Amino acid sequence: MLYHLAMVLETFYSGFNVFQYITFRTILGVLTALGIALMIGPAVIQRLVLHQVGQQVRDDGPETHLEKAGTPTMGGALILVAIAVSTLLWADLTNRYVWVVLLVTLAFGLIGGVDDALKLARQDSQGLRARTKFSLQVLAALAASTFLFATATDPVETSLVLPLVKEWVFPLGLGFIALATLVIVGSSNAVNLTDGLDGLAIMPTVLVATGLAVFAYASGHHVFADYLGIPSVPGVGELVIFCGAIVGAGLGFLWYNTYPAQVFMGDVGALALGAALGVVAVAVRQEIVLFIMGGIFVMETVSVMIQVLSYKLTGRRVFRMAPLHHHYELKGWPEPRVIVRFWIITVVLVLIGLAMLKVR
């Protein structure tokens, strides 16, 4: 909104021309989202406490988690407000990608919010039925994927792009819709599985969003895209502002979510943030890079799949508990050690992902 106002005012004062620069608006987007999260955080937490919106803890989880019972949850709503306001203020609202990523994020946030609300109403850790939640996620992702496919103006927008090799671009046709839906839903649930310790999910989300912002900026600028040998996707540069909003909102939330957490994001935040990363990766045609940079999310998801499959086939568990972070907790690692080491791994993976911009 302010971006469009600035473009009108530019006719009266040339200084407003600075708002045309994506980098400038991204900085404003980060600061706006960060400021909103920090300012309204205490009020949101206080209201959650007042209405007894407390975390339900599984009885079969690590004993150290029992003390987390009652900690305010659904703090992810704070993140979504900060992201939405910041994006609406500083992004170009005539850009289709901006609306796709924003609506997907809010749709998955709504699904997560209903799930959280049911858990609170029933006073247990079971919310929406798994089949119902998954179906709603698929519908939301399918709608976004179909829209992107139908509005694509260049074949590369619906092709599979493999990193490291310039020429490896494979047209997917209708397969794009299936791949995009899988990435969005998979990313959403992967972040949700990772959200089990204080600050564990939010910092990797911030780091991956930062990495995707670099790809979005390069892909949206045809000169940079040609130089780096990555697909040039007109319009995706505006997603840098959205990614910046995720970074700002995430850091603001981490202020209250760091160990020991004053608030948890809940499914309303985790499902939404995961979907946001997934849909941005789809838009910039970097699904495989997301798989690499978000390796922690992948590890957590795979650990659950291995655990379930092993138990069903052999009756034995590979890990002491899944997802993976609980395994290390039960091995005796203090919670902060698990969190920070997972953060460090994510930093390394994001750097590897960014290195693929040059290694081609």
Swiss-Prot record:
<keyword id="KW-0808">Transferase</keyword>
<keyword id="KW-0131">Cell cycle</keyword>
<keyword id="KW-0133">Cell shape</keyword>
<feature type="transmembrane region" description="Helical">
    <location>
        <begin position="168"/>
        <end position="188"/>
    </location>
</feature>
<feature type="transmembrane region" description="Helical">
    <location>
        <begin position="263"/>
        <end position="283"/>
    </location>
</feature>
<dbReference type="Pfam" id="PF00953">
    <property type="entry name" value="Glycos_transf_4"/>
</dbReference>
<protein>
    <recommendedName>
        <fullName>Phospho-N-acetylmuramoyl-pentapeptide-transferase</fullName>
        <ecNumber>2.7.8.13</ecNumber>
    </recommendedName>
</protein>
<dbReference type="GO" id="GO:0008360">
    <property type="term" value="P:regulation of cell shape"/>
</dbReference>
<keyword id="KW-0479">Metal-binding</keyword>
<keyword id="KW-0472">Membrane</keyword>
<keyword id="KW-0961">Cell wall biogenesis/degradation</keyword>
<feature type="transmembrane region" description="Helical">
    <location>
        <begin position="235"/>
        <end position="255"/>
    </location>
</feature>
<feature type="transmembrane region" description="Helical">
    <location>
        <begin position="199"/>
        <end position="219"/>
    </location>
</feature>
<keyword id="KW-0573">Peptidoglycan synthesis</keyword>
<keyword id="KW-1133">Transmembrane helix</keyword>
<dbReference type="GO" id="GO:0009252">
    <property type="term" value="P:peptidoglycan biosynthetic process"/>
</dbReference>
<comment type="similarity">
    <text>Belongs to the glycosyltransferase 4 family. MraY subfamily.</text>
</comment>
<feature type="transmembrane region" description="Helical">
    <location>
        <begin position="338"/>
        <end position="358"/>
    </location>
</feature>
<dbReference type="GO" id="GO:0051301">
    <property type="term" value="P:cell division"/>
</dbReference>
<keyword id="KW-0460">Magnesium</keyword>
<comment type="pathway">
    <text>Cell wall biogenesis; peptidoglycan biosynthesis.</text>
</comment>
<dbReference type="GO" id="GO:0071555">
    <property type="term" value="P:cell wall organization"/>
</dbReference>
<keyword id="KW-1003">Cell membrane</keyword>
<feature type="transmembrane region" description="Helical">
    <location>
        <begin position="288"/>
        <end position="308"/>
    </location>
</feature>
<comment type="function">
    <text>Catalyzes the initial step of the lipid cycle reactions in the biosynthesis of the cell wall peptidoglycan: transfers peptidoglycan precursor phospho-MurNAc-pentapeptide from UDP-MurNAc-pentapeptide onto the lipid carrier undecaprenyl phosphate, yielding undecaprenyl-pyrophosphoryl-MurNAc-pentapeptide, known as lipid I.</text>
</comment>
<keyword id="KW-0997">Cell inner membrane</keyword>
<dbReference type="GO" id="GO:0005886">
    <property type="term" value="C:plasma membrane"/>
</dbReference>
<feature type="transmembrane region" description="Helical">
    <location>
        <begin position="73"/>
        <end position="93"/>
    </location>
</feature>
<keyword id="KW-0132">Cell division</keyword>
<dbReference type="InterPro" id="IPR018480">
    <property type="entry name" value="PNAcMuramoyl-5peptid_Trfase_CS"/>
</dbReference>
<dbReference type="InterPro" id="IPR003524">
    <property type="entry name" value="PNAcMuramoyl-5peptid_Trfase"/>
</dbReference>
<dbReference type="GO" id="GO:0008963">
    <property type="term" value="F:phospho-N-acetylmuramoyl-pentapeptide-transferase activity"/>
</dbReference>
<feature type="transmembrane region" description="Helical">
    <location>
        <begin position="136"/>
        <end position="156"/>
    </location>
</feature>
<dbReference type="InterPro" id="IPR000715">
    <property type="entry name" value="Glycosyl_transferase_4"/>
</dbReference>
<keyword id="KW-0812">Transmembrane</keyword>
<dbReference type="GO" id="GO:0046872">
    <property type="term" value="F:metal ion binding"/>
</dbReference>
<feature type="transmembrane region" description="Helical">
    <location>
        <begin position="98"/>
        <end position="118"/>
    </location>
</feature>
<dbReference type="Pfam" id="PF10555">
    <property type="entry name" value="MraY_sig1"/>
</dbReference>
<dbReference type="GO" id="GO:0051992">
    <property type="term" value="F:UDP-N-acetylmuramoyl-L-alanyl-D-glutamyl-meso-2,6-diaminopimelyl-D-alanyl-D-alanine:undecaprenyl-phosphate transferase activity"/>
</dbReference>
<feature type="transmembrane region" description="Helical">
    <location>
        <begin position="26"/>
        <end position="46"/>
    </location>
</feature>
